[in-house]
Design a protein with these regions (language model features):
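Extended, domain-scale alpha-helical bundle/helix-rich regions
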Residues: 260-265, 271-275
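ATP-binding N-terminal substructure of ATP-dependent carboxylate-amine bond-forming enzymes
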Residues: 157-158, 285-294, 299-458, 467-474, ...
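ATP-dependent carboxylate activation and anion-phosphoryl transfer catalytic cores
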Residues: 1-247, 251-258, 265-266, 290-295, ...
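Short, basic interhelical loop/turn and adjoining N-cap
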Residues: 223-232, 274-285
């Protein structure tokens, strides 16, 4: 209790309730639904149970489907929302047939003979200063789910599904290979106790370490209030870990009996290798040896605990002797999904996976989906012909490939998760459909990418690759500050930063990353005041169609996933747009792209610089597809199985006569104290879209969709860095013409006043009261425009941005964003709103 449902590790079926408690809850739930008056549809009810007395309390009731409903649907195979929709139009439960059994009715309550574990995924590293304590405010950004025969197996599968570079309950204090000589047991135990006192995302790993160091169940329960049953399960896993360590160190190998015991408990090959010092490949070879009596097997989710046969192949892995996979003899393709949602990799990629599955069905091929995210459409049992609810690791994917023997595997739709498997799968002889792993590496590897651009005669900002701090200092000095720094091979701009001087670079190199030959740091000249552009293309290996070119509304330096963007570009010259189209075509053909490709460019003084190229589906594919009315992911999938764009009838992209604006949605209200200032590290968790024939209206709609309604009147507060003052003057003049009053801090106010604008000077927070934050709190400000330059100004203006967020004000931290906001306000005040469906817009192109 006290931790939001979405942030809790969840287990089904309930493991620690008595049958009497379960029946009381079931009866209470039915009485509540009838009392509230829910005649049809789904409802969610949360209870609290006192484990000592059995006292039952109702926490809340939602007369609708909820996040828990989605999880329950995936856990049981019982599609709650689908059935609720049928009930709403007049069906009764006994009239709806269960899709999975094809025999039973929806009135037959689902029963499961396996264990499901859901673990949330967090992104605290993205939000400097955020409190990592888990409370009643949900803070997770995604989740992974696993299915196994036991809680232990399911828990370990769920942990590796999170993609945290952890293979299991890895020690946080260096105890994976036992307690080392000279280890400070007392100091480590105190650190662990400190971590256990409050609920945090990593708590379960610290519980494992506490068990390794001998902490009793009584003390663990006193610190965590985790039920003793779960503590005993974790203790059993730690005992097996210890036996693995001892046997491997004693005889240099593992007996088959212990290996199979570990595999049945959900230990991955990598985790066993980590514990024993043996190679993961040798462990795989041992368990795959000819004549072995046991192997990885697959069971079906059937909603009825095997009482009836399941006709829908919804599968999970375990270790045993009887396999229910029953692969068909049809030609088939495996699609790897994106895993748990996270910042930088969300449902945009799931959209691509689902459309790929649709395309394969249209082409008569059997579709196999592999994913572990219960929030997605790709893990619906009827999206693909066969669904494997499994972690997206090399081991788990190879096991499925070995069982199914597909024509090939699709990696380019699930984001970075499946792309990381390109090389190991290729080495294992697995056919990769679409763009080759070598082409992906040419685009990802900075030195090979530079050679590619030189070969094509394309421009790139000056850059260098540092493998040490000294190299970084030397490269940055040669390029000249400001520079953009980031680790190689990342998605979502993780640990990416703009640094303005050597001191900032040294701080970054010391805290954000550890540079090495295996993990170099990329340093690029930061193109200040440049316009960033995103472009998506589709290629069949011979023809390239540039489907969409998007102009970012925020300037270069704000992560592409966080910037609003417009399709088509709203301010770029047509000559620049054509040059970007030419460069996209050259890049796709040189890389040998088959399928989708995304590239990002910076435009400065009409010169186009290539920032990066991603020969895969990008997060902008759904936006572009809806903006132009073409299912790009579907077409791309068809090119990957040999169809040409000419054959598919897609040889040029439509030119829409309307404008589409994508705006990012941020979780800042979940993290009090976190700065809302945008930069090269991605922070958004979703996006919305506005469409209109007029850019101003399209932008205004996108802001409303993101929950930031543009004001129609009132006072606008302007405080900008010195280089932004000319742009701020133009914005202020436009706002003044629209009837807004202007407030500004002393420096900005003086500049505006010197250029003939009437402006009221307000105090900074450090200059006395009433200051600007007081005015925002008192409701005297309607719009905030705040840009910063130095680190000191970042800190000085943090409270302004935070209070604007708290009050729900429209706020802009770039001048291009502010200019777009003014265009939106002007459209609302002076231009007529037209309402059309998406289909109508796409028919008018």
């Amino acid at each position: 209790m006290g931790v939001h449902t979405g942030d809790s590790i969840t287990v089904a079926p309930a493991m620690t309730l008595t049958d009497k408690e379960y029946q009381r809850m079931r009866d209470a739930a039915l009485r509540i639904i009838r009392e509230i008056g829910v005649d049809t549809g789904g409802s969610n009810i949360q209870f609290g149970v006192n484990p000592d007395t059995g006292e039952l309390v109702v926490i809340e009731m939602n007369p609708r489907v909820s996040r828990s409903s989605a999880l329950a649907s995936k856990a049981t195979g019982f599609p709650i929302a689908k059935i609720a929709a049928k009930l709403a139009i007049g069906y009764t439960l006994d009239e709806i047939t269960n899709d999975i059994t094809g025999v039973t009715k929806a009135s037959f309550e689902p029963t499961i003979d396996y264990v499901v574990v859901k673990i949330p995924r967090f992104a605290f590293q993205k939000f400097k200063g955020a409190d990592p304590t888990l409370t009643t405010q949900m803070k997770s950004v995604g989740e992974a789910m696993a299915i196994g025969r036991t809680f232990k197996e399911s828990l370990q599968k769920a942990i590796r599904s999170l993609e945290l570079e952890l293979n299991g309950l890895a020690s946080r204090v260096g105890l994976d290979r036992g307690i080392p000589e000279g280890f400070d047991r007392q100091g480590a135990m105190e650190r662990i106790r400190q971590q256990l006192r409050s609920p945090i995302a990593e708590r379960i790993w610290y519980v494992a370490d506490a068990i390794r160091l001998g902490m009793s169940n009584d003390e663990l329960f006193a610190l965590t209030k985790i039920d003793a049953w779960f503590l005993d399960q974790l203790r059993d896993l730690m005992r097996v870990e210890q036996r693995l360590v001892e046997q491997a160190s004693g005889q240099g190998s593992l007996d088959d009996a212990l290996l199979w015991e570990a595999k049945e408990l959900g230990f991955s090959d990598e985790r066993i290798a980590q514990l024993t010092g043996l190679a993961a490949a040798s462990i795989r070879a041992q368990r795959s040896a000819p004549g072995s009596t046991r192997s990885v097997t697959y069971k079906r989710v059937d909603t009825c605990a095997a009482e009836f046969e399941a006709h829908t192949p919804y599968l999970y892995s375990t270790y045993g002797t009887e396999c229910e996979a029953r692969p068909t003899a049809r030609e088939k393709v495996i699609i790897l999904g994106g895993g748990p949602n996270r910042i930088g990799q969300g449902i945009e990629f799931d959209y691509c996976c689902v459309h790929a599955a649709m395309a394969l069905r249209e082409e008569g091929l059997e579709t196999i989906m592999v994913n572990c995210n219960p929030e997605t459409v790709s893990t619906d049992y009827d999206t693909s012909d066969r669904l494997y609810f499994e972690p997206l690791t090399e081991e788990d994917v190879l096991n499925i490939i070995q069982r199914e023997n597909p024509l090939g595997v699709v990696l380019q739709f699930g984001g970075q998760t499946p792309l990381k498997l390109a090389i190991p799968l290729s080495k294992a002889g697995v056919p990769i459909l679409g763009t080759s792993p070598d082409a992906i590496d040419r685009a990802e590897d900075r030195e090979r990418f530079r050679d590619l651009l030189n070969r094509l005669g394309l421009q790139q900002a000056e850059s260098g690759i540092a493998r040490s701090v000294d190299e970084a200092v030397s490269i940055a000095a040669n390029i000249s500050y400001p520079v953009m720094v980031r680790p190689s091979y990342v998605l979502g701009g993780r640990a990416m930063q703009i640094v303005y001087d050597q001191a900032g670079l040294l701080e970054y190199m010391g805290s954000a990353v550890k540079a090495s030959h295996k993990h170099p740091v990329l340093i690029d000249k930061y193109l200040s005041d440049a316009i960033e552009v995103d472009a998506d293309a589709i290629c069949d290996g011979r023809r390239v169609v540039v489907a969409g070119i998007m102009e970012h509304i925020e300037e270069a330096g704000v992560h592409s996933g966080d910037s609003a963007c417009s399709l088509p570009p709203y301010s770029l010259d047509e000559t620049v747009v054509e040059e970007i189209r030419r460069q996209m075509t050259a890049l796709a053909l040189e890389l040998g792209v088959v399928g989708l490709m995304n590239a990002q460019f910076a435009v400065k003084d009409k010169t186009v610089y290539v920032l990066e190229v991603n020969p895969r589906g990008s997060r902008t594919v759904p936006f572009v597809s809806k903006a132009i009315g073409v299912p790009l992911a579907k077409l791309a999938m068809k090119t990957m199985i040999g169809r040409s764009l000419d054959d598919l009838g897609f040889v040029t992209a439509p030119k829409p006569v309307h404008l589409s604006v994508k705006e990012a949605v941020f979780p800042f209200n979940k993290f009090p104290g976190v700065d809302v200032l945008l930069g090269p590290e991605m922070k958004s968790t979703g996006e919305v879209m506005g469409i209109d024939a007029d850019f101003g209206w399209a932008f205004a709609k996108s802001q409303a969709g993101a929950g930031a309604m543009l004001p129609m009147s009132g006072m606008a507060f302007i405080s900008v860095k010195e280089t932004d003052r000319p742009a701020a003057l133009q914005v202020s003049k436009q706002l003044h013409r629209l009837g807004f009053g202007i407030q500004a801090t002393s420096g900005t106010a003086g500049y505006l006043r010197d250029h003939g604008l009437e402006v009221k000077t307000v105090l900074k927070v450090t200059e006395g009261r009433p200051h600007i934050v007081d005015l925002i709190k008192n409701g005297e400000v309607a719009l905030v425009v705040n840009t910063v330059g130095t680190a000191a100004s970042h800190a000085d203006s943090l409270s302004i941005r935070r209070e604007a967020l708290n009050k729900g004000l429209a706020y802009y931290t770039t001048m291009r964003g502010a200019r777009a906001a003014v265009m939106g306000i002007e459209a609302i005040l002076k231009k007529e709103l037209t309402i059309r469906s998406l289909q109508e817009y796409n028919c008018r192109r």
